Amino acid sequence: MFRGIYETTIDAKGRTSLPARFRDVLVESFGDERFFVTNSVPVDLGGGVYSSGLLIFPYQEWFIFEESFLNGKGLTSAQRNSIMRTIVAPAVECSADKLGRVLVPPHLRKNAVLEREILFVGAMKKVEIWSQSEWDKVRAHDMKAFPSDSEAVAELGL
């Protein structure tokens, strides 16, 4: 599982380094160094403002998601189209080079507003990528919502 938050940078050409621990997890837990990068589900910050990062899916986990999406019962046509345009269509297969460097394509960098300072955030079977500025907004939103989530957290044993 992916855990932890790692701060790093991305250059103007979209090159960044996938944390070594996450590269190890890809191979040790998921059996493949390849992965897919795509847009994350936008976070509603209220007042018509949304924030978005990116998601890294381990290679096989992406195909599990695709199968689930294709067989998804209960999705309306509008929901299916929105998911297709937002998450499925922009997905790109990637792998890190021997030094751990990854190239994030321009269309994904633009959507996630990736600037110089970025974060890789472990999210169990996925990894989130956020610009520092967008992460700060989402975390502030999460902290406001957290008290109302305390019952759900307690049910998880925390």
Swiss-Prot record:
CDD domains: MraZ_C, MraZ_N. Residues 5-50, 91-134 form the SpoVT-AbrB domain. One of its GO terms (cellular component) is nucleoid. It is found in: Cytoplasm, Nucleoid. The keyword Signal does not apply. Gene3D superfamilies: Transcriptional regulator MraZ domain. Pfam families: MraZ (PF02381). GO terms for biological process: negative regulation of DNA-templated transcription initiation. Keywords: Cytoplasm, DNA-binding, Repeat, Transcription, Transcription regulation. The keyword Phosphoprotein does not apply. GO terms for molecular function: DNA-binding transcription factor activity; transcription cis-regulatory region binding. Forms oligomers. HAMAP family: MraZ. NCBIfam families: division/cell wall cluster transcriptional repressor MraZ (TIGR00242), PRK00326.3-4 (NF001482). Belongs to the MraZ family. This is Transcriptional regulator MraZ. It comes from Geobacter metallireducens (strain ATCC 53774 / DSM 7210 / GS-15).
